Amino acid sequence: MERKDRLMEIPVKKIGEFVKGERVEGFFLLKSVTLKTTNSGGKKYLDLVLSDKTGDILGKVWEIKPEHEELKSNTVFKIRGTVNSWQGTLQLKVEHASKVTEEDNINLDDFVQSAPYTSDEMFKTIKDTVHNMNDIDIKNILNRVLEINKDKLMYYPAAKSNHHSIKGGLLYHITTMLKLAENICGIYDFLNRDLVYAGVILHDMAKIKEMSSNEMGIVDEYTLEGTLLGHITQGIKEIEVIGKEVNADSKIIMLLQHMVLSHHYEPEYGSPVKPLIPEAEMLHYLDVMDARMYDMKKAIKETKENEFSERIWSLDSRRIYNHGMYEKNK
């Protein structure tokens, strides 16, 4: 009876429903568990990233107890705590954590955020785009890149924690950008469609080598090569190797490398050169547009109507306003 009464007092909620100041309880996937030390006093605490279908939230375990030693990443736990805010972002102060049992009837897939389309559908969209290209060298390079990376591409996210950091997120990012590119190329019809589409497909492909992800689309860490070189350098290396393997024209190889090399636009963001061809310029803005719209849509979904979101780091720490006038069922 005591257990039942307590559950009636503490709401069971999804992360997207959390409100500052309330106590909550529920089942959450632990995406990461990190032991840290406070700057003052040297006290140990745990940083958690909790996740469900509706989003992620940072969890804090300030008082480490024996029960917390069982907390492991990529597992589901029953968590109880209080929702608070730090620097404009919601956090969960974890008070209790327990392992799930068979009686809880937990399905791991119910906690994994994933793209709104199947990976097979999205991969087919990319393959169809390549099939309809005119330049044989670009087609050969892309088909080989897709062949090499297909298995991991089916579940890899586009980032560890920023835009499209979900299962199948990299495919989703690419296919959305391809839709944008198709419309843009219809307006600016002097652009070489094959180059634009190829840039879209290739620009983040090396994130598969930059990050280490499990099949749930959760990135545990960056690879050694990814940390030392980054996906832009890794990407242009792969284009060079595959381009020579398929005997592609050296100019085509160079143009594709330039597309990847310049798509972050600024040196401080990883691009040593700015776009020097219009297709590369367009690629940059397609990338930025899709990333920002993804993050804004996510913020709106997590924010009540006529209220502002928490501060979104990837959007220059802006708070996004939900005016409630968006297209429904989208």
Can you annotate each of these PLM segments?
Residues 2-24:
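OB-fold nucleic-acid-binding modules
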Residues 28, 74, 177, 287:
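Divalent metal-coordination and catalytic microenvironments
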Residues 33-44, 55-109:
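OB-fold single-stranded nucleic acid-binding module
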Residues 47-52, 213:
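Short, acidic/hydrophobic/Gly-rich beta-strand patch recurrent on exposed beta strands
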Residues 105-225:
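Acidic/His-rich, divalent-metal-binding segments that scaffold phosphate/diphosphate chemistry
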Residues 162-164, 172, 183-303:
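Divalent metal-dependent catalytic cores for phosphoryl transfer on phosphate-bearing substrates
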Residues 284, 291, 308-317, 323-330:
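N-terminal intrinsically disordered, cationic/polar leader segments
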